[in-house]
């Protein structure tokens, strides 16, 4: 038996985001309407470059933003909803009564940018290819878990790679339909399919460019590529409304309209994302109308709101958190740990394995100053990775507060007193263009120095793609990063932050079997009360273990020129590298 899914399907998951109520919209106009510049081009000024154009590899918002303009998924989120879906490359779909079989009818008459027609075999290939590639810190864990069962997050096992035939058995073609065979019911599965990692690629084009050719040998050769190692890392061939013209890393991404798009043509002939590190330069570009929207750091919000001709969306409820991450086993090749010894001129590789170090750092952070000065009030402290607006969030979970006395006690106890006696020197890292991250590092730097002048923190900015690759290699002793929801369920927050196979925990070399077990119990339970108890326990363990320091949940503020029309905010979608198809100027 199957239950028929209508054109718009609502997933039975609790979501408490009311965007239409919470988003406020304001204009800052001076001297009448602005004269529209470049009416056929949508121009974005962003601070962050993309990591990859490969949908199976890219797992950052900058990459996802470009991918969603070039590629398409089987279904897409409906407007601002995180739980309703409309057809995209699938025209219809069914879900079996037991929740373990998903079937999608593939749209006829669609072509890739290469000119090749879309077929059900392309869809099957796209998901099998993603699991074959399975970049260690990529998004593929979200497919392995529902398709292979809880506790299965990767193609790699202690006995080698999962047999290719097992991967192929999970996605099958049946005429014009493609069927997913899940190992377990999995409520967020449609949310996962609707995001950038669910994008459909051109099988023939991929193979022509050296990608997986369907064989075991190719599987072994292409599994877990290094940074930039995907055969389609810097090229693209989707079915979407825009085509890749050029990606110049660190400079710009340029897209052109797909005039053969199966849907209505996009309003813009081109979409250009310029990578501009400095806020002052982005501010000038936005004010002159040379760009249509720009990433505005929190420190620049007030002056941007006062600029003429600007449309502002503020108090936007995001599903985004920020944190300091500790590296539990720093790679020997790191250049950010000084001498590599606890001699006052560096730190040892396992510096943060001592819980008193982690607790001392946590008590040394000043949340009030950070939220007031760095975020200019557009944020709030949260105590665990689970953000407000997600089911099972509880505001009374235990959390750290600034307490330099407690910080001193823990740092005196760390490393049997040797840390306090000798001091240390290390480097904190934040992303280029992230002014709030810089301020967070400075707060910690100053407070630790106040506790003991022998505690020396250096601060260094890095480009976003470099941070991602260095994070994977374990070379960053401590760094600022964040997480935005892949889908609106607490599992999507606790897994990356705390499970030993999660993207952050794995990069940090953090592992706790008790935590892993609780996380797996929570996602497998269908009982609301049981899940609440389990997430309460997970939040308490996060507090006790301090695998990272949760800094804040962000309230979004977005800035456009007042001639931009059609913007609909969805907390699951990236914003500044936004879906330009629905936008226009007028």
Protein language model regions, located:
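Long beta-strand-rich cores associated with HINT superfamily self-processing modules
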Residues: 558-586
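Extracytoplasmic
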Residues: 37-39, 69, 88-90, 99-101, ...
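Surface-exposed binding/hinge segments that line
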Residues: 124, 138-217
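Active-site-proximal polar cores
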Residues: 551
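Extracytoplasmic/periplasmic ligand-capture domains
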Residues: 4-9, 20-30, 77-79, 107-137, ...
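N-terminal hydrophobic or amphipathic helices and topogenic motifs
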Residues: 2-43, 49, 56-61, 68, ...
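Short Gly/aromatic-enriched secondary-structure transition segments
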Residues: 56-66, 121-123, 193-198
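N-terminal lobe/hinge region of extracytoplasmic solute-binding protein
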Residues: 45-97, 128, 235-239
